[in-house]
Amino acid sequence: MYSGAADAESAATLIHDVWNNCIVEKKDSTTDPYTRTKNGSGWFYDDFNDALSNLFNDHIFQQQIGWIKDNQTSVAKYMKNLKNPPDEYKEAFDALKDLYEVYCTITDCAVNPTGSLNSFTSTFNTADSDFIKYYKAFSVYK
């Protein structure tokens, strides 16, 4: 779960940066290939959706998103198998469920970004900080 969230954090950060940099026309060597014409050396796209499409059509980024989706599937399968824990593990299970809920939010930000740039950023930032908080809380039970 942790590695999937870390990969999602990296992907969602790039999504944010491409989205933002296209809107504000900020030059950045990491985002320019997606936000500017002529493979990053031309004009900025008028529509940020073109920049996001470029990112999501990038072969390397597609691989990263594919891995995150595979991780989501694996983690969901494990969580499904953890039903009805013994009483002695109830607190740990509750902490894990909280962590899983935030994990789903942060990975969804990477796999299926929605809303406006502001709402996406808010959702992502909250999920990112909550994941660390819930991960630390769950770590007590390791």
Where are these regions (language model features)?
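Amphipathic, heptad-repeat alpha-helical segments
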Residues: 65-87
